[in-house]
Structures are given as C-alpha cells and as structure tokens.
Amino acid sequence: ALSSAASDVYKRQVVGILVEDQNSIYGLEHLKNANLIHICIMYVGLLLAYMKIKQKGYFWEKVNNGDLYIPEKLFEKVACVAVLFVLFQFSFQGHMILSGVDRGIVRSSIGVWGPLTTYVGRFGMPALLSLSTVLYFYIYDHSKKINRQYVIVVICGILVAIMAGGKANIVMMFLPVILQCGGFLKKRYLVTFVLFGALSIVIVGMFQMNMSFAQSVSYNIYRATSLSNMGTLCVWDKFPTGDPQAYMSLLIGLGERIISFLFDVDRHSVEFLKFSLPRYITYLYYGNAQGAIDGVVNLTITSFGEAVYWFGRKFYFIASLIFAFVLYKISIWVFKTRKKDYLLKNVIVSVFFTSLCLGWLNSTSGCFLSYFFGFTSLVYLFGTYMLIKYVLKGSSLNK
C-alpha cells in the first residue's frame, strides 16, 4: 500500500488532487464561485458589445448586382483554392489522420509542414468560407454555377476540418459561416448545424480512437466536461497566488522553435515547459509526463485558468475585467467592418475572432497577448490577408 506522503504525490501527479487544508479539494466551492464570476464578467462584455452593435446598426446589407458586380469567376477562384487546400491537407496530414494515427503524433512528425497545415485548417480555409458566405448570402441573384461552387467550398471545408484531426474542428471551421450569416438563417438551419457539429465530433472520435458510437458519445461528454476542466483545476491548485514567472508565457507567441533557438533550450525538455503553461500543467498533473515533454499531450486551460495563473485565486477578477474589455472591443470590431468597401478587412477580423479569440477562450497558451499577437499568429493572419487579396484581385470588391 502507498504511504500517506506517497499517496499525496501520486494524487498530485495522476489526477491533480491535492487536499491543502484537509477540508476541500482545490478549495472547490471557492473555485466554482470564482469561475462563475469570471463567466458573468465575460458575458457582460459580450452583452455590452451586442447593445453597441445593435445601436449603431453594424450589420450586412443586401447588395444589388447593379450596385456591386460580382463575377462568377470570383467564386470559381475561391472553389479552386479550396480544392487545393484539400489536396495539400491530405498529402501532408490527412492520410495519417484518416488511417487512425493520433493527432499529437501527427503534429510532432510532419516537421516543417506543421505550420502550413495549421494555417490551412485554422486560417486559410475558414477565411475562404467567411468570404464566400458573405458573397453568397448578400447578393440578390445566384446562378446555378455560383450555387454549385459555394457547395464545393463548403464540402472542402468539411474535408479539411476532418483531416485537421481535432474532434471539434468541423464546428470551429464553420464558426465564420455562422458569424457571417447567422442572422440570415432560419432557426431550423441553426439547429441542424448544431446537431451536425455534435454528430461530427462523435463520428471523428469513433475513427480516431477505434470506438463504437456509444463509446465515442460517452468519451466526448467526459472530454467536454470533466477532462476539459482538469487543466483549469490544476492551475487553481498549483498557483494559489499566481505565478511570479507568468511573464514567460508571453514568449510562446514567438513559436517553440524560435524560443528553443534564442534560449538554447531543447523544446522537448523539462526546462522548456516554463514557456508553455498547458504543457507544464500536463507534465505535473496528467500522468503522462513524457507526452507533455514531447508536446503530444496537452491539458486544456480556459481563460479562467489564465486569470488564476496571472493573478491568483484572490485577484483573478482583474484579468477577467481585462478579458471582458478585449472581448467587447473585438466583437464590435467584427461587426463594424461589415461594409462592402471593407470586405477584405472584415474577413480578416472575422477569422481573427473565430480562430484566435474564441479558441483562446476555450484553450489558452498562458497569455492572450502571445496568443493573439504572437509571431506565428501574425504570420498566419498576414498569410490570410494575402490569400483573400489574391482571390479578390481584379474584382470591384477589392478597393
């Protein structure tokens, strides 16, 4: 049998449970209340943004073909690029994902192609979907050719999302579509999207983990509830007063390889983990220390976990207020660019919101600044800008 001390160590390493004061695990009641307060503060930011957007009337308006001529070749170009993305994703990553190789192993094995597959899955393809959705839903007349090409773009989006490997990738891929045309769609279509997204998560889980349908449903419920909260629980336990070295997470925005070069630290070493909060917490608590070192396993840490990481249990709300303000400004920014003359800017901002902002709320790297404005994020956004500029080249939309 394990001794009492050994038992405590085992609990900390494997399941992240530490009874600090013999009264509560993680200070559970305080944790739940703090998390609820954090969520409420964030929702207030969104509510204020919605009120501002509605007051100013920041919405897309229908565009007559006579007012703004959109040639069919524009949709044809979007569809061609989307097909190329599918072929690229399959060649470098998709064939392994579809054959059942774990996503973490795929991510660590494709080397220099990794950033490009990430770009296609998280930025390039969502940008094409965002652009084509605006063009499709806010033009009065559609030809059969445009209808067919829009369907091709949507199908390509589904295929790229599946080959990205994540179970929620299809949902994340089509968030720009819902963002652009959500007010235009009838409720039954929105419900259909939610059901389709949930079903896709289950089906992808079946193929990835060789599970039955029922097993995949059960696992994904567990993954979306207990396991997704574990990283935040561990941050709450590990940093009751915040981490004095939290500023180190600012550097992760440079990218792991650049950090490794600048500081002469192997990115697959224990010493490197101080730069990556998710990998560090995974190393300490998850029970797969080598997986954390190799970068193939990560616990999810939410924006609330980031707030605790920086300010501790007592003053986390300072970060919550900052995050709510950031969310407020970005949300308004997305809708404020909904003008025909700002189409390029709107697509970039929309992808920034869905791929970076919403992604950060659910899974932080340790600092939203490095997540939003890190070197890799800026490169991806610049690549997206060049992509959409190329697609719009020669069109009256590109002003």
Language model features with spans:
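Hydrophobic alpha-helical transmembrane segments
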Residues: 150-152, 171, 194, 317-318, ...
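Juxtamembrane "helix-exit" motif on the non-cytosolic side of transmembrane helices
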Residues: 14-26, 94-96, 360-364
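Hydrophobic cores of alpha-helical transmembrane segments in multi-pass inner/ER membrane proteins
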Residues: 37-57, 125-136, 176, 377-392
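Hydrophobic alpha-helical segments
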Residues: 299-399
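Single conserved hydrophobic/aromatic residue that forms the stacking wall/gate
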Residues: 1-6, 10
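Membrane-embedded catalytic interface detector for glycan/lipid assembly enzymes
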Residues: 52-188, 197-214, 362, 369, ...
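Small-residue-enriched transmembrane helix-hairpin modules in multi-pass membrane proteins
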Residues: 108-117, 205-323
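Membrane-interface segments at the starts/ends of alpha-helical transmembrane spans
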Residues: 19-37, 112-115
